[in-house]
């Protein structure tokens, strides 16, 4: 597979506005070496405050005993025999259980246990910084503590959306407004470089030695993949998409709709960080289309109505950014 030649890029109907000069990625051999050595992501904003830490390890195959030990620390006034639990099974890599006493779950602690070896893909310290940053701007629940292999945080009231919901105009506009709010969170000091290329090089380093040379000829060789990655970086860095704070993983189940308060909030900040604004938008649209299992549904999304939804989403997302500035809420 040859590296594709350069081609002029067509003008999009919506231009992602850059409000401040954006430093382009300039990965050199030192940065590639840093990624291959397992270095953490470029640092984001500093933590707002210290987070409680408990030296407790929760068995991912038997989560309840460890979760209840943490609840004794976080809610000492709760009687152990009265604590109720509810497991969530939508997660792909992590284990999640809710602990509460009252039926309405108004005071509910979520205990999340990291998936095995996910630290190879996720910078957990950076995740905590993201959590605190978003909380400070009114976009995340309270983070109660971290422990050896996970964290505890406030349960967010509402329902996780499905693919049948995010096409509704009222809801996709709420999603666009929440995305716009997050995108206007300003970095302290100079704007960080996009996290995209660091992650791509890091992922590539993790898998390059695991590719079986006996695989089909349809699977590109490592050298070809490396060339394509360099080509992508060279050309995508020239598109002048603004670098903003992004969620970077906006699949349906990471969007919570609160019908009482009339808003949506995003959850799971493992991959959040400063990145190209266009990536966050495209990632959400990709999850949107990828949620449909049947060819009929896929063509429905790709058709005229899908185009109208995309245009309306972008109009809602980009319009507030002319004047909006998000300041910390606490």
Where are the predicted features?
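Helical subdomain adjoining the active site within ATP-dependent kinase catalytic cores
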Residues: 3, 217, 323-330
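An amphipathic alpha-helix signature
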Residues: 64, 68, 197-204, 208, ...
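Juxta-kinase regulatory segment immediately upstream of eukaryotic protein kinase catalytic domains
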Residues: 2-86
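Catalytic-loop of the protein kinase fold
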Residues: 245-247, 252
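ATP-binding pocket architecture of kinase catalytic cores
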Residues: 86-231, 235-245, 260-261
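Active-site activation/catalytic loop segments of kinase-like enzymes and analogous catalytic loops
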Residues: 278-326
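Amphipathic alpha-helical protein-protein interaction segments
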Residues: 56-60, 120, 218, 303-307
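Catalytic activation segment of kinase domains across protein kinase-like and atypical kinase folds
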Residues: 253-292
């Amino acid at each position: 597979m040859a590296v594709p030649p350069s081609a002029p890029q067509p003008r999009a109907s919506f231009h992602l506005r850059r409000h401040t000069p954006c430093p382009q990625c300039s990965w050199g051999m030192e940065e590639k070496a840093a990624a291959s050595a397992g270095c953490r992501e470029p640092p984001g904003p500093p933590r707002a405050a210290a987070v409680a830490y408990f030296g407790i390890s929760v068995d991912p195959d038997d989560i309840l005993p460890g979760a209840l030990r943490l609840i004794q620390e976080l809610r000492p006034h709760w009687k152990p025999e009265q604590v109720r639990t509810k497991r969530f099974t939508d997660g792909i890599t992590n284990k999640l259980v809710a602990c509460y006493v009252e039926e309405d779950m108004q005071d509910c602690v979520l205990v999340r246990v990291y998936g095995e070896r996910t630290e190879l893909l996720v910078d957990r310290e950076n995740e905590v910084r993201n959590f605190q940053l978003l909380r400070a701007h009114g976009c995340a629940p309270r983070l109660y503590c971290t422990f050896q292999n996970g964290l505890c945080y406030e349960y967010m009231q509402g329902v996780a959306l499905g693919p049948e919901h995010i096409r509704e105009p009222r809801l996709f506009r709420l999603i666009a407004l929440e995305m716009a709010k997050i995108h206007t969170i300003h970095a302290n000091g100079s704007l960080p470089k996009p996290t995209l290329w660091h992650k791509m090089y890091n992922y590539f380093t993790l898998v390059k030695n695991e590719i079986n040379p006996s695989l089909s000829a349809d699977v590109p060789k490592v050298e070809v993949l490396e060339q394509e990655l360099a080509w992508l970086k060279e050309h995508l860095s020239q598109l002048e998409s603004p670098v903003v704070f992004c969620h970077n993983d906006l699949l349906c189940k990471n969007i919570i709709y609160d019908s009482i308060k009339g808003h949506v909030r995003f959850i799971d900040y493992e991959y959040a960080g400063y990145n190209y604004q266009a990536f966050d938008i495209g990632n959400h649209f990709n999850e949107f289309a990828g949620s449909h299992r049947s060819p009929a549904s896929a063509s429905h999304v790709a058709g005229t109505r899908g185009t109208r939804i995309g245009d309306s989403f972008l109009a809602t997302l980009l319009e507030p950014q002319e004047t909006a500035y998000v300041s910390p809420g606490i």
